[in-house]
């Protein structure tokens, strides 16, 4: 479904001339339907797609990644921005509940990127066919609860962030694998 800005309901976004639109998908089915449009639009399956994975609370660095993704897929391509605060990256007692959840502001920022006339300070204008924002809940990402199969990150799990947050890297690998599968 497409998202109006600034409201968080599901309805079309008016696009700037020559630009695509923002679609908000909250469920696996909505994401699949949004991605299927690419398949119907190009029978060869050749619509370029880029995925920018985030936990939301978007800032200029995220917008730069989205702009680069759009540059790489070109005007006929699709950029998928995922916004998901992954509970598997947080151990008990960590800051999961304190992590900012700013979906409406994030979508507004992405819409501004899509509509901007250009220039690094105003976010570069995206010449991209479509921008899909996939913002699932934990229940959507992990419909059967915690995954039955876990990915072992190996020795990296005990250094860097893993030295103080032992579940962090396993959670990151799990969400990346799941998002890659859902956006393929």
Predicted regions and their residues:
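Nucleotidyltransferase catalytic core that binds NTPs
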Residues: 2-184
């Amino acid at each position: 479904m497409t998202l109006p800005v600034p409201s968080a309901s599901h309805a079309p976004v008016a696009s700037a001339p020559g630009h695509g639109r923002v679609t908000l998908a909250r469920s696996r089915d909505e994401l699949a339907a949004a991605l299927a449009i690419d398949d119907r639009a190009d029978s060869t399956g050749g619509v370029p797609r880029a995925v920018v994975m985030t936990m939301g609370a978007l800032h200029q660095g995220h917008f730069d990644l989205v702009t680069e993704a759009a540059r790489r897929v070109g005007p006929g391509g699709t950029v998928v921005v995922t916004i998901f605060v992954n509970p598997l990256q947080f151990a008990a007692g960590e800051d999961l509940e304190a992590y900012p959840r700013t979906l409406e502001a994030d979508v507004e920022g992405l819409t501004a990127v899509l509509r901007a006339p250009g220039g690094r300070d105003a976010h570069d204008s995206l010449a991209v066919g479509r921008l899909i924002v996939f913002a699932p809940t934990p229940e959507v990402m992990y419909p059967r609860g915690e995954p039955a199969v876990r990915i072992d990150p190996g020795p990296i799990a005990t250094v860097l962030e893993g030295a103080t947050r032992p579940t962090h890297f396993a959670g990151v690998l799990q969400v990346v694998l799941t998002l890659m599968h859902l956006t393929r």
